[in-house]
């Protein structure tokens, strides 16, 4: 089948945007390339780069945020560690849909998982002087690799495609046994590849993270969107697969952007395991005066980055978490629009970015 977009046009567009390696481009760069090629070629593209199929935001979140604004929350700085309703409802949401116990104290709001991850890369790379490298299990979000470059943090990566099932353990251990990996990051499910790690693979990641004392950063942007399973029923199996069942060294990044279509308000949580939350790191204490992981994450890194997440948006996220855990908001059903999009992506010879 002939290419619908001439290679020359594609190459010229990359050159015009100063992109040397398209595989390493950020999501925003990919979107810009797609937009330009659409305009120049007159060919319609299937856009998956932003992962937003145009769904409306959840009404319960909008109403809760409107109420918070009407009550004057916009004039008040939020607690850097999060408002109490969000912390408690986030903890309950994690239990309802992952069957994992995380104390409210470990659920900390961030300005989207973008900021949450940015600050996690910083703190994880500073916990132990011997561990200064972030390991990416690809495919992931390209901008996260951009973040570690901006921060000057060392990083390694490998593609999960060639190391599924029993091949994952030896490959992952080949990096961890070097002793310099501070954290492992991956997305599950991943967009636009729509690769879902299996329970067995997540067990491998969790057990090796414990063995080598490495922190797992699990990005759950598309939580519940493995539509082959009947996920999304609160407090009932099957639950979202997670490495958190197999290690205490984890942070779950849960964003409102995709699961609640609340991307514009930039609100998420970092759910830190109880053990990691209270773990004391001498290097953090020496550098910042705060040695416990979660306390340092919030009061040092997040505080310096934004002085807190949007006050009113925290009320929105709390309300959506509560409605979902109460069984009144079926966010998995509401996001099922992703299913035909991902199916089209994986089965049709469509031009997509």
Q: Predicted regions: what is each one?
A:
Residues 28, 84, 88, 142, ...:
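A structural signal for well-ordered alpha-helical segments within the folded catalytic domains
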Residues 47-49, 185-187, 217, 254, ...:
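Short beta-strand segments
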Residues 73-212, 217, 223-246, 251:
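Conserved core of the PLP fold type I
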Residues 4-10, 17-115, 321:
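N-terminal small-domain helix-loop-helix segment of the aminotransferase-like
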Residues 344-353:
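Conserved small/polar residues in nucleotide/adenosyl-binding loops
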Residues 58-61, 227-231, 263-266:
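Short aromatic-enriched loop/helix-cap "lid" or pocket-rim segments at secondary-structure transitions
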